[in-house]
């Protein structure tokens, strides 16, 4: 199959070609490091009825994959583990990356992060400087990947977007609906309580000034200005409290991958 039009965040093998078997992510690979994929060289094996069948080894389970009639594709699917293995070099400016869950992804050469689209994985993969691993060179152990983002479910539209802050209780703008929401509920709750408290204090001060300076205000009309300022500050604080109390909250889909 051609990989030129494949989305960078989707698996290279779509569900329409995978039959009724859905690839799963083995839990024991969670600490593995993503690696760049080079197409392994395919070889020919002899069989009694043919002169030679081109085959390659699966990069996941090492089973033999028959390439007969598939040499025009960029990747092929293993019939044993249902994972993809590249047989051609990626398009210009692209590279293959295999997620620790064994999902084969394609992304730009300059990409630093990529998200795994599998529902049971959803890792945020920090590519960094990726070393190309040839078929003859065994994979070297790598340091654990430091999390640099998390997936957040928008409180307005319900879509998931990548939030690169390492702390919650901040405001975020959804790239899908372009609306502002709070990542976590602690920030709007604290600010709502703070504005309600300040607003009520200003209102009480304004009422006290109004009652206590009735006679004084008849002689000095500038006293009305202090009344107006106190009432206005209290009203502004209460309006801000209503804003923070009604703001939508977006929650992280799960902890850091």
From Swiss-Prot:
Lipid bilayer topology: Multi-pass membrane protein
Enzyme class: hydrolase
The keyword Phosphoprotein appears for this protein: yes
Chain positions found as Phosphothreonine: 22
Gene Ontology BP term (one): phosphatidylinositol dephosphorylation
Chain positions found as Phosphoserine: 33
Residue spans of biased composition, Basic and acidic residues class: 1-10
Active site residues per record: 107
Ranges for region Disordered: 1-43
Keywords: Cell membrane, Cytoplasmic vesicle, Endosome, Hydrolase, Lipid metabolism, Lysosome, Membrane, Phosphoprotein, Transmembrane, Transmembrane helix
Compartments where found: Late endosome membrane; Lysosome membrane; Cell membrane; Cytoplasmic vesicle, Phagosome membrane
Chain segments annotated as transmembrane: 192-212, 227-247
EC number(s) recorded for this UniProt protein: 3.1.3.78
Gene Ontology terms for molecular function: phosphatidylinositol-4,5-bisphosphate 4-phosphatase activity
Gene Ontology terms: cellular component: late endosome membrane; lysosomal membrane; phagocytic vesicle membrane; plasma membrane
Biased composition (Polar residues): 13-23
Superkingdom of origin organism: Eukaryota
Short sequence motif CX5R motif: positions: 107-113
Catalysis: reaction(s): a 1,2-diacyl-sn-glycero-3-phospho-(1D-myo-inositol-4,5-bisphosphate) + H2O = a 1,2-diacyl-sn-glycero-3-phospho-(1D-myo-inositol-5-phosphate) + phosphate
Entries under PANTHER family matching the protein: PHOSPHATIDYLINOSITOL-4,5-BISPHOSPHATE 4-PHOSPHATASE (PTHR21014), TYPE 2 PHOSPHATIDYLINOSITOL 4,5-BISPHOSPHATE 4-PHOSPHATASE (PTHR21014:SF5)
Function of the protein: Catalyzes the hydrolysis of phosphatidylinositol-4,5-bisphosphate (PtdIns-4,5-P2) to phosphatidylinositol-4-phosphate (PtdIns-4-P). Does not hydrolyze phosphatidylinositol 3,4,5-trisphosphate, phosphatidylinositol 3,4-bisphosphate, inositol 3,5-bisphosphate, inositol 3,4-bisphosphate, phosphatidylinositol 5-monophosphate, phosphatidylinositol 4-monophosphate and phosphatidylinositol 3-monophosphate. Negatively regulates the phagocytosis of large particles by reducing phagosomal phosphatidylinositol 4,5-bisphosphate accumulation during cup formation.
Protein name as catalogued: Type 2 phosphatidylinositol 4,5-bisphosphate 4-phosphatase
The organism of origin for this protein: Mus musculus
């Amino acid at each position: 199959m051609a990989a030129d039009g494949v989305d960078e965040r989707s698996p290279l093998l779509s569900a329409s070609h995978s039959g009724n078997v859905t690839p799963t992510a083995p839990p024991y690979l969670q600490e593995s490091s993503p690696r760049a994929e080079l197409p392994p060289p395919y070889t020919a094996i002899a069989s009694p009825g043919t002169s030679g069948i081109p085959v390659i080894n699966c990069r996941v389970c090492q089973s033999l994959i028959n390439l007969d009639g598939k040499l025009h594709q960029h990747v092929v699917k293993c019939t044993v583990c249902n994972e993809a293995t590249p047989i051609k070099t990626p398009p210009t400016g692209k590279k293959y990356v295999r997620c620790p869950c064994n999902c084969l992804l394609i992304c730009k050469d300059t990409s630093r992060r990529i998200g795994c689209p599998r529902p049971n994985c959803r890792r945020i993969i920090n590519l960094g400087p990726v070393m190309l691993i040839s078929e003859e060179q065994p994979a070297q152990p790598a340091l654990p990947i430091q999390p640099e983002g998390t997936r957040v479910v928008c409180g307005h539209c319900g879509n998931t977007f990548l939030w690169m802050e390492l702390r919650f209780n901040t405001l975020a703008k959804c790239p899908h609906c372009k609306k502002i929401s709070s990542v976590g509920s602690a920030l709007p709750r604290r600010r709502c309580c703070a504005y309600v408290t300040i607003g009520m204090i200003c209102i009480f001060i304004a009422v006290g000034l109004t009652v206590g300076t009735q006679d004084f205000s008849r002689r000095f009309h500038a006293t009305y200005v202090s009344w107006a300022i106190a009432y206005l500050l209290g009203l502004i604080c209460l309006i801000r409290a209503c804003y923070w109390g009604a703001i939508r909250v977006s929650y992280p889909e799960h902890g850091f991958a």
